[in-house]
């Protein structure tokens, strides 16, 4: 928050969402204090593991974490339907030999959506439990997002549409 010139000492309530590699932290602050904070033990690494699992189940191909990360970066999108593909290499589960397949962006979206749904659900739950004055402040100022996982394209559109709140993404999320 401090790196993005957000005044954490403000009397206005703010929601900060840090979408990191290993965890996602959703925090509401006001006057320099934490009102509520929820830590999800999931993040970008969770998405990578899901991509590995989806490729394994749908293509019978074992891929590594670096390949999953490349798929997430190149095909990952919070809104489905771009129609892009990427060829990946791995080990065929049936023959045990090296093999390659074309992975479609909708597979990567399928791997992303459970994580994104959980983040939206947690933000909604927090918004429902905080005092109305803080909710009003957050609706006015928006929800602030940071962390490497926020680099997934169209997250702003997804969160704005799902939460009906303005979203503000860090210029330098890492």
Where would I find each of the regions flagged by the language model?
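Short coil/turn connectors at secondary-structure junctions
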Residues: 9-13, 23-24, 140
